[in-house]
Amino acid sequence: MESLAHLPGIFLPLAGCVLALSLTTIVYRTVTNPLSHIPGPQISKWSSLIEQYYWFAGTKVEYVDYLHRKYGPIVRVTPTEVDICDLPAVREIHRVRGGYLKSEWYKSLTPPGVTSLLTLIEPAQYSEWRRLLAGPLSDTSLGKVEPMVTNHVHATIDRIASDLQSQGVSDLYKWWTYMATDVVSELSFGEPIGLLARPKETAWVMDYLDKVGIMHAWRTTFPFVFVLGRFMPVHPFKHAIQAIGLLGKWARQSIQQYRQHIQEQPESPKPTLFTKLFKTGKFDDFQLTYLAGSYITAGSHTTAVTLLYLIYAICSDNEVRQKLLAEIRTLPENFRHDELRHLPYLNQVITETLRKYAVVSSALPRVVPAGGATLAGYYLPGGTTVSTQAYTLHRNEAIFPNPEKFDPSRWESPTQDMKDAYMPFGGASRMCIGNSLALMEIRLTTTLFLRRFPEVHMSRQNGMRDEDLAQEQYLIMAPRGQRLLVEA
């Protein structure tokens, strides 16, 4: 018992030694880390806290862009991640069969046991899924659904006109989101969710879409929040999680209805984005339900936000407006989408919108292949997470002079560097399969909307201001004010 009395006196020196040894180990590992020679702030060598702070604030892309302007084309963002905006290095990272696989970070975007095209890492599995999913979204296949898309566009513009007549203003963020959601849901299952026809009954969809960005931030950083949320009386995403449940219920019902439709018409079922998936028999209803949700997220929000910023840019520049209107007036009354594909200025306006207001402009993390690689003049060992972000690439002054100016004419004769740095739909090896659908919706909507409302302008009612259009950047970008009120 007497020996135990001496323990307090022994414990303090022992604890001090353990602490000193731990700190020494941390310092040694930090100093000898193979990324220690990469430029960047000192905090990036020790912790991810600063990066996580900006990620949750929706301003990480601006923080990383600031680091590039201060430190150069390659910067250390966290102890294990670097970001690169050097164009030759970006080409190498996103080269088809280049060996730079997606990082494990993507898997944190989905619940355990669930896979989507976005989160697939292995190239062979991704190629198999892409073959099944991309066919209905090709330019050729989309020609068959053009009448359906056009009908939704007309219905949306009628809703906007009704708002303008009764209230004097209309919120384009709301209506573009409703339209794009109905389009992608009908393409997925043959029937739309019904936001345009029943906006009050389906308002829960907006509860989900409005929170999807910050929910991704929480899921990728603190996934346990969603697990514990089921047992918490108060939860920051209560309404969004309820909306996810309603979305899942709608998707399951739609899947069952489509299965019955296939049984009734096995030789000629109504084609949808999921028709081939049904035929393979490899996807259960749980997986299909999640895919439906991911399609609606990716296919609605991105298109709606792009349209919102396109109209905002036109409202802000009368020269752009008049030049675009003059081109649109050359179209016949009953034009087709193919004719819009060949309108030079319309497509320059769209391309410039996607440059300055890219909806997916945050980091695209990849993993350096085994054996390491030299990128932007620095050696990176295999396994290093290396990211690129369109936000910085699209603002490279050497490639895009005066990058903050909305200038569609810069795309009259684009250089090869402009084409390579332009990444609104992701890198070449994993480019979004829905880009053709998005462009069809954007071309048709822009043209038909401006034909109906050539004098549209941003409203100043209800406190609407330019600051509402500040970009909030998570996995996908959205206007911080989540609205664009217009008058016409």
Curated annotation (Swiss-Prot):
SUPFAM superfamilies: Cytochrome P450. Its main location: membrane. Gene3D superfamilies: Cytochrome P450. Keywords: Heme, Iron, Membrane, Metal-binding, Monooxygenase, Oxidoreductase, Transmembrane, Transmembrane helix. Its cofactor is heme. It is found in: Membrane. GO terms for molecular function: heme binding; iron ion binding; monooxygenase activity; oxidoreductase activity, acting on paired donors, with incorporation or reduction of molecular oxygen. Coiled coil: none annotated. Pathway: Secondary metabolite biosynthesis. It holds the Pfam family p450. The chain crosses the membrane at residues 7-27. Cytochrome P450 monooxygenase; part of the gene cluster that mediates the biosynthesis of nigerpyrone and its derivatives carbonarone A and pestalamide A. The biosynthesis pathway begins with the polyketide assembly by epaA to form phenylacetyl triketide precursor from successive condensation of two malonyl-CoA, presumably with one phenylacetyl-CoA starter unit produced by the phenylacetyl-CoA ligase epaB. For the nigerpyrone biosynthesis, the reactive polyketide chain is released as an aldehyde through the R-domain. A nonenzymatic cyclization and dehydration may create nigerpyrone. This is Cytochrome P450 monooxygenase orf2. It comes from Aspergillus niger (strain ATCC MYA-4892 / CBS 513.88 / FGSC A1513). The lineage of its organism: Eukaryota, Fungi, Dikarya, Ascomycota, Pezizomycotina.
